[in-house]
Design a protein with these regions (language model features):
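Expand to "…catalyze enediolate/carbanion chemistry for C-C bond making/breaking, isomerization
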Residues: 2-354
Length: 354
């Protein structure tokens, strides 16, 4: 079995060659999805009306988010897209990926990095270890150059701690991580949803991230090789979170996939993520990113169906390709499909080969 160590910290930076090779190799792995992407073009959904994303920083735009320990010596090159240039979003971690003895080094690394961050398409977030570390990060020069923060162990019992240090004036967005035992309590999740609304945080939240490994740890479980997260007890918890948060307008992103040598299982899991209404996924290695994002490409049939549903002159009920379409009940699905198509493209169908 091959092993990859994303968290190696050699000082000369040459170790990224392996990651870069894996990055390009993984583009070949992604071909096992057996899909071809249609040429890029302006997306339309009726007449000459173009579909426009509701927000330039959306849960969909994050794609596969790569976690990196903030102790890495090559953080600057990745943050400024000199390494892994195809990356859509990155989260610099000062929590689980950094030992307590290395925390100050991680913060020093970020303090040196932030003023030198260049403008570009890469979406950059920081995962603070705790509210105290968040407060320290907010004092750093250049902190306004990151898009926001992924808040770990987020729940009703920690919400007040985060809010006490939160500075809303800098325009940062939030990625709260749901990974405590409270996730298994339906009522507590409803309470937290209501508190987010009461405190006016909803507009700041890009998505709520599901911390799969922390939740499995609470159950004393690690998924076996070949299993998706939906083959574990978390299937019910994920469905419950979707039922609590999605109707209120929040988006949920999917947990990490632990294995690097079973891309076919990763593909199966991402397809199940989408079926459960999840958007985006955390990646533990660059090799996973093209595999994950290949699954986000929209099948042409779905794209054309979504465009027809959102057309201004769409009938109240109609049939398309032997499927029942009702704009009043399918609108949110259709909007999500066109958002994915805008970001990741449309998968060509058989008719496009002629």
């Amino acid at each position: 079995m091959r092993t990859f160590n994303l968290f190696r910290k050699e000082g000369d930076g040459s170790h990224l060659d392996d990651s870069e090779r894996s990055w390009h190799r993984s583009r070949m792995i992604a071909l096992c999805v057996n899909r071809r992407v249609a040429p890029q073009r302006v997306l339309q959904h009726g007449g000459d009306e173009s579909y426009v994303s509701a927000s330039p920083l959306s849960a969909v735009a994050l794609g596969a988010s790569l976690y990196l320990p903030a102790t890495r010596p090559d953080l600057m090159m990745i943050a400024n897209s000199q390494k892994l240039p195809g990356l859509r979003s990155v989260i610099f971690c000062t929590e689980d990926a950094v030992s307590g003895r290395d925390l100050e080094r991680a913060l020093d690394n970020l303090a040196a990095l932030l003023p030198k961050l260049e403008t570009g398409p890469l979406l950059r977030f920081i995962r603070p270890r705790n509210p105290t570390v968040l407060w320290r990060l907010l004092q750093l020069d250049g902190i306004e150059r990151v898009q926001g923060f992924a808040l770990p162990k987020f729940g009703p019992h920690t919400l007040g701690d985060w809010l006490r240090v939160w500075d809303d004036s800098k325009g940062h967005r939030l990625l709260p991580i749901l990974e405590t035992a409270e996730v298994f309590d339906h009522r507590k999740m409803e309470i937290m949803r209501d508190r987010l609304e009461d405190y006016g945080l909803k507009a700041r939240i890009v998505c709520l991230r599901i911390g799969g490994n922390d939740l499995l740890n609470l159950l004393g479980i690690r998924r076996r090789r070949g299993a998706t997260i939906y083959d574990t007890p978390l299937r019910g918890a994920i469905a419950d979170l979707v039922r609590v948060f999605n109707p209120a307008g929040y988006r949920l992103s999917a947990p990490v996939f632990d294995y690097l040598d079973t891309p076919e299982v990763l593909i199966r899991e991402v397809e199940a993520d989408l079926q459960h209404g999840l958007v985006g996924k955390t990646a533990i290695h660059p090799a996973q990113i093209p595999v994950i994002e290949s699954c986000y490409r929209v099948p042409r049939e779905d794209y054309e169906t979504a465009a027809a549903i959102l057309a201004p002159d769409a009938a109240a009920v109609f049939k398309l390709r032997d499927s029942f379409c009702e704009p009043a009940t399918h609108r949110r699905w259709a909007e999500g499909v066109l958002e994915r198509a805008r970001v990741f493209g449309v998968v060509a169908g058989p008719s496009d080969d002629h």
